[in-house]
């Protein structure tokens, strides 16, 4: 689960992590009022959406007087902000964060995330903040520190010293940053985060460090332990189809291809997407119906994937272990009763009650269903139908 910058900064502040003063605004008048209340002569007017790259997309502006605050707020609030993370459709800006300015002398990058390959928590830091970290890693890898932390040991001074060394900090600056990272690491672990990112982390003329941006992502499976975090969910930022799918126990992620996938099990779903790509076609979604799929959930899955007008073929790939293939077959029939399906359906069913499922489909008189003998054959059929 993702949260907004203003929410992340409130959590930071509650845990002793330095942030600049700021207030959320839901209208232009409130934005101006917030700037007045914050005081000063410079403010950042920031769009609040669940995506990075807001500045490049025109969603972050620096105002040097209250008239500029009003002007920028009126332009950003209500805009459809498109960034490299939103796709061309963009996201509607419904709230702003008005933040006090600071005398910035240096920008850094700092993130804490789970490194699955190394089975460690990893701190990533760079002296090149405010930039695309992937670009920095490619062009100037020596400017990035990657420090692995064994969760059983936790964050120690030597971890922080390595970060300070790569960032080129002096002794006093290093002490301040290490203290800040220690608090961030504790927060990351205590709140079951997947990722914590500050880009940029700034150093002021006074030698102090502040989180100028804040991005936090939480493990959905651990939210039951953190009701105060779960309350921060903004469903307007989530894909409506993905949200609806989750309500029916379906794991759905929309992609930009033309082959809709319906699979049971995340591993098989990813393998199905891989072989579709390998065949020369492109998957339109990730969709895991899970082990307890019923005819009703399969019908709902059909309804969701058919809303995507880019879909030309549906590929159903089911291995009946926990889920029974006949349930999937009945779900297909249920779906075709309620939703008009005018595109080809390639079906590969194997495992529990596969023979019964084949009989159900054979007796259904559905003319647009094609049976695949195995996964490779299914991908080949899909590619031939897409063209």
Curated annotation (Swiss-Prot):
Residue ranges of the ATP-grasp domain? 9-244
- Membrane-spanning parts: none
The record's top EC class is: ligase
Q: Name one GO molecular function term.
A: succinate-CoA ligase (GDP-forming) activity
Q: Specify which residues bind ATP according to the UniProt entry for this protein.
A: 46, 53-55, 99, 102, 107
Q: Which Gene3D superfamilies match?
A: ATP-grasp fold, A domain, ATP-grasp fold, B domain, Succinyl-CoA synthetase domains
> What name does UniProt use for this protein?
Succinate--CoA ligase [ADP-forming] subunit beta
The EC number on file is 6.2.1.5
- What's one Pfam family here? Ligase_CoA
Cofactor binding note from Swiss-Prot or TrEMBL: Binds 1 Mg(2+) ion per subunit.
Its cofactor is: Mg(2+)
- Role description: Succinyl-CoA synthetase functions in the citric acid cycle (TCA), coupling the hydrolysis of succinyl-CoA to the synthesis of either ATP or GTP and thus represents the only step of substrate-level phosphorylation in the TCA. The beta subunit provides nucleotide specificity of the enzyme and binds the substrate succinate, while the binding sites for coenzyme A and phosphate are found in the alpha subunit.
Pathway(s) of this molecule = Carbohydrate metabolism; tricarboxylic acid cycle; succinate from succinyl-CoA (ligase route): step 1/1
Per the UniProt entry, the signal peptide is: none
User: Which positions in this protein are listed as binding substrate?
Assistant: 264, 321-323
Q: Does the keyword Ribosomal protein apply?
A: no
Q: What does the entry list under GO cellular component? A: cytosol; succinate-CoA ligase complex
Which gene produces this protein? sucC
Q: What biological-process GO terms show up in the record?
A: succinyl-CoA metabolic process; tricarboxylic acid cycle
SUBUNIT field: Heterotetramer of two alpha and two beta subunits.
**Binding site residues for Mg(2+):** 199, 213
**What is the species listed in this Swiss-Prot or TrEMBL entry?**
Campylobacter jejuni subsp. jejuni serotype O:6 (strain 81116 / NCTC 11828)
The family line of this record is:
Belongs to the succinate/malate CoA ligase beta subunit family.
Which keywords does UniProt give here? ATP-binding, Ligase, Magnesium, Metal-binding, Nucleotide-binding, Tricarboxylic acid cycle
Which catalysed reactions does the entry list for this protein?
succinate + ATP + CoA = succinyl-CoA + ADP + phosphate; GTP + succinate + CoA = succinyl-CoA + GDP + phosphate
């Amino acid at each position: 689960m993702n949260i907004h910058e203003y929410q992340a900064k409130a959590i930071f502040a509650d845990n002793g992590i330095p942030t600049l003063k700021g207030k959320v605004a839901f209208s232009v008048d409130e934005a101006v009022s917030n700037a007045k209340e914050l005081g000063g002569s410079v403010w950042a007017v920031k769009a609040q959406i669940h995506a990075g790259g807001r500045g490049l997309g025109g969603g972050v502006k620096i105002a040097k007087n209250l008239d500029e605050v009003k002007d920028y707020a009126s332009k950003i609030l209500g805009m459809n902000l498109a960034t490299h993370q939103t796709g061309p459709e963009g996201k509607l800006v419904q709230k702003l964060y008005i933040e006090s300015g600071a005398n910035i002398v240096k920008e850094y990058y700092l993130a804490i995330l789970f490194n699955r390959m190394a089975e460690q928590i990893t701190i990533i830091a760079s002296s090149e903040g405010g930039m695309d970290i992937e670009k920095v890693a490619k062009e100037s890898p020596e400017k990035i520190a990657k420090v692995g932390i064994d969760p059983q040991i936790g964050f120690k001074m030597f971890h922080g010293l390595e970060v300070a060394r790569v960032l080129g900090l002096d002794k006093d600056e290093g002490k301040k940053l290490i203290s800040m990272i220690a608090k961030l690491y504790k927060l990351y672990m205590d709140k079951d985060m997947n990722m914590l990112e500050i880009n940029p982390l700034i150093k002021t003329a006074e030698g102090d460090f502040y989180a100028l941006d804040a991005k936090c992502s939480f493990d959905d499976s651990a939210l039951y332990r953190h009701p105060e975090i779960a309350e921060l969910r903004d469903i307007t930022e989530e894909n409506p189809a993905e949200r609806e799918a989750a309500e029916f126990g379906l794991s759905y992620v929309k992609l930009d291809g033309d082959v809709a996938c319906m699979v049971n099990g995340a591993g098989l779903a990813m393998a199905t997407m891989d072989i579709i790509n390998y065949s020369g076609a492109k998957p339109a979604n990730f969709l895991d119906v899970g082990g307890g799929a019923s005819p009703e959930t399969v019908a709902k899955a059909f309804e969701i994937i058919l809303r995507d007008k880019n879909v030309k073929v549906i590929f159903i790939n089911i291995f009946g272990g926990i889920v029974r293939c006949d349930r999937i077959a009945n779900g297909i029939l249920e779906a075709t009763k309620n939703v008009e399906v005018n595109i080809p359906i390639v079906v590969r069913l194997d495992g529990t009650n596969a023979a019964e499922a084949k009989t159900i489909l054979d007796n259904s008189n559905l003319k647009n269903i094609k049976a695949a003998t195995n996964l490779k054959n299914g991908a080949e059929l899909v590619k031939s139908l897409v063209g």
